[in-house]
Amino acid sequence: MNPEQFQMALAEKGIELSDDQMKQFHDYFEMLVEWNEKMNLTAITDEKEVYLKHFYDSISAAFYVDFTKFDTICDVGAGAGFPSLPIKICFPHLKVSIVDSLKKRMTFLDALAEKLGLTDVHFYHDRAETFGQNKAHREKYDLVTARAVARMSVLSELCMPLVKKGGSFLVMKAAQAEQELQTAEKAIKLFGGKVEEHFSFSLPVEESERNIYVITKTKETPNKYPRKPGTPNKLPIE
């Protein structure tokens, strides 16, 4: 998917990108490849692959979820900024917070936000477990996203504490997601969530399966969650 195909594919979904926004994606791609030579940000560096598997894939959530109704977003373990920064480029009104435990990624994201001229974007170098216990952020976000490889039960413990009551947790997964969801149902309920919607689709060109789950926060997360750093991964609630 080249930049022109990317722009057309989004337009077909009702997301029209201006020349300035296309320039932001171009600069994002160039910086990603340049910085990737000195730090491991992504295994995907081919332009067409980046536009499809990073940019388009990140924005695909907006085909099913109306981002205009959200104000604050927190992206847990965003790595090189996915999915929140491509979404931010498309929906500039969003106030985005990104949490990642690797300091060098923060350096990249800071430089990237400055280069792209992104405002209302904040980066926090922290473990998700610690961040979720921080009163300044706990239950403060309209939407929390995770496009991560961790199991859904683990992601729920890391992300649900950050979602405000009535807000949403958006999980982006590849294949075998239904099985993961069944295992995570106990955890989702414990942390105050209810699975509201599930969307399944194929990524264009390569036709790989994608799943998006929208989990609504119906009640507050018990204070003891998230547990200490490392514990959710070692002893997932399932």
Swiss-Prot record:
Gene Ontology cellular-component annotations: cytosol
Pfam families assigned: GidB (PF02527)
Protein name: Ribosomal RNA small subunit methyltransferase G
Chief location of this protein within or outside the cell: cytoplasm
Endpoints of the signal sequence: none
Residue segments, region Disordered: 219-238
UniProt-listed Enzyme Commission number(s): 2.1.1.-
